[in-house]
Amino acid sequence: MARAEARFVVDRPKGEVLAFLGDPVQVGGCLAFVANTEKTAEGVRWKVKAPMSAITQTPHLDVVFRVEGDSVHWQGRGRHLEIQGTFAVAETLAGATEVACTLEVLPLGALAPVLGPLAAAQVSGQLDYFVREARARLAP
């Protein structure tokens, strides 16, 4: 499993940040590999952008979000990929909100030996992109 971690601070109340991070549409909009978010009868689905969808043969990820206290855990599973993330939020002494993030990518099935090195090479860049986008969207 490929894994990356990051932290960032935004000048917004903790409740607003937690609501943003608990929303699959908002989080999907901050991930470079997500083309759009669809609501289905089963739940929420992220459509995976090309070329990632073609390379991984994973056109979409079925996503589940869970908010528990001051943290959010989400998991997206598709044909050959499982991607999950966690966010833990805390108020700083200055009244801003700090977010600790993790992103994990687990290749599945017959393509796992091929996708494993690709995931390891890209997971940090994917999380960096998320942090930039989330900070921009949460800016006052």
Q: Model regions: which residues?
A:
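Hydrophobic ligand-binding cavity/cleft-lining segments
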Residues: 1-43
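Beta-strand/loop substructures that line and gate deep hydrophobic ligand-binding cavities in soluble
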Residues: 75-125
